[in-house]
From Swiss-Prot:
Family annotation (Pfam families): DPCD
Tissues expressing the protein: Highly expressed in the testis. Weakly expressed in pancreas, skeletal muscle and heart. Expression increases during ciliated cell differentiation.
Role this protein plays: May play a role in the formation or function of ciliated cells.
Native source organism of the sequence: Homo sapiens
GO process annotations (BP): determination of left/right symmetry; epithelial cilium movement involved in extracellular fluid movement; establishment of localization in cell; flagellated sperm motility; lateral ventricle development; spermatogenesis; third ventricle development
GO cellular component, one term: nucleus
Signal peptide start-end: none
Similarity comment: Belongs to the DPCD family.
Name of the protein this chain belongs to: Protein DPCD
InterPro entries referenced in this protein's UniProt entry, alphabetically: DPCD
Length: 203
């Protein structure tokens, strides 16, 4: 079963954990050299950040690619090339999950709710956001469903609009909820350092 396959790869990955500023930071190193870093709220175990880093063909470490979490604010000192040109007025896309849903927020979208259309494209395995006034178009996948090899279902998709922000929710299939719960049990077994015990690779 695919869900077990992904969970198994997390179980067998080399893991280090650090408790810092109310967050549990976990660094995974996979046998193929890929790295994943996650940050969880210490009290709720809610996922706050997930990012990936892959080695280049020449063996050099690439940049961290954010999958879940708030993009680094402008002027944060660690700007990626894609953030340098970003204006405060441009739509800002980010993913912030809840316990039961994958959730994305697109800030700086001032149009009323009835202008937006959010749908699943089964063929391309992605979600498409478009506006009737043709001012905005966005296509994005749900890597978690790809990793678990689960289908996308229109019935699990919903969206809301408030304060110039479009909030898109996709209810997590039960297989994902179970796998995430199993992972939390697994992470409890990882020896966790505290921020004053030394550094962690996720820093």
């Amino acid at each position: 079963m695919a869900v077990t396959g992904w969970l198994e790869s997390l179980r067998t990955a080399q893991k280090t954990a650090l408790l810092q500023d109310g967050r549990r930071k976990v660094h995974y190193l996979f046998p193929d050299g890929k790295e994943m870093a996650e940050e969880y709220d210490e009290k709720t175990s809610e996922l706050l950040v997930r990012k990936w880093r892959v080695k280049s063909a020449l063996g050099a470490m690439g940049q961290w690619q954010l999958e879940v979490g708030d993009p680094a604010p402008l002027g944060a000192g660690n700007l990626g090339p894609e953030l340098i040109k970003e204006s405060n007025a441009n739509p800002i896309f980010m993913r912030k999950d809840t316990k039961m849903s994958f959730q994305w927020r697109i800030r700086n979208l001032p149009y009323p709710k009835d202008v937006y259309s959010v749908s699943v494209d089964q063929k391309e395995r992605c979600i498409i956001v478009r506006t009737t006034n043709k001012k905005y178009y966005k296509k994005f996948s749900i890597p978690d469903l790809d990793r678990h090899q689960l289908p996308l279902d229109d019935a699990l998709l919903s969206f809301a609009h408030a304060n110039c922000t479009l909030i898109i929710s996709y209810q997590k299939p039960k297989e994902v909820v179970v796998a995430e719960s199993e992972l939390q049990k697994e992470l409890k077994k990882v020896k966790t350092a505290h921020s004053n015990d030394g550094d962690c690779k996720t820093q």
